[in-house]
């Protein structure tokens, strides 16, 4: 039983690392104009599971990382209006910091497409990712926006 729990924890940690890397990659693509193939190559060879500038990055589930990044890029034109609808009036997505946009886009993509991960886990994981980059009050906004989007895509999970 302990071995099963360890394997689940390792997979969760690898996915958490993939989420963090996906948000960093999406941010880099938006700010630096990097292409998706360049970002994949850079992250997979230099970041995932490596030490960069004194920070040790956990090994990440590369396929999960690729899925989230590619999915956000593919679906961004459809995801952005959904996020805009969930944001407070007067705060359109374009007014929000780029790293926060990356967190919300990645979380929204995963809520819509990764049904293998419970909605509450997705929201919690991206709140944790947000803590790595942004202030406390903005983390609350990430929680509220992703919770609203989760209820839209996965209402059945919240009816229980």
From Swiss-Prot:
<dbReference type="InterPro" id="IPR011605">
    <property type="entry name" value="NusB_fam"/>
</dbReference>
<comment type="function">
    <text>Involved in transcription antitermination. Required for transcription of ribosomal RNA (rRNA) genes. Binds specifically to the boxA antiterminator sequence of the ribosomal RNA (rrn) operons.</text>
</comment>
<keyword id="KW-0804">Transcription</keyword>
<dbReference type="InterPro" id="IPR035926">
    <property type="entry name" value="NusB-like_sf"/>
</dbReference>
<comment type="similarity">
    <text>Belongs to the NusB family.</text>
</comment>
<protein>
    <recommendedName>
        <fullName>Transcription antitermination protein NusB</fullName>
    </recommendedName>
</protein>
<dbReference type="GO" id="GO:0005829">
    <property type="term" value="C:cytosol"/>
</dbReference>
<keyword id="KW-0889">Transcription antitermination</keyword>
<dbReference type="GO" id="GO:0031564">
    <property type="term" value="P:transcription antitermination"/>
</dbReference>
<dbReference type="GO" id="GO:0006353">
    <property type="term" value="P:DNA-templated transcription termination"/>
</dbReference>
<dbReference type="InterPro" id="IPR006027">
    <property type="entry name" value="NusB_RsmB_TIM44"/>
</dbReference>
<keyword id="KW-0805">Transcription regulation</keyword>
<keyword id="KW-0694">RNA-binding</keyword>
<dbReference type="Pfam" id="PF01029">
    <property type="entry name" value="NusB"/>
</dbReference>
<dbReference type="GO" id="GO:0003723">
    <property type="term" value="F:RNA binding"/>
</dbReference>
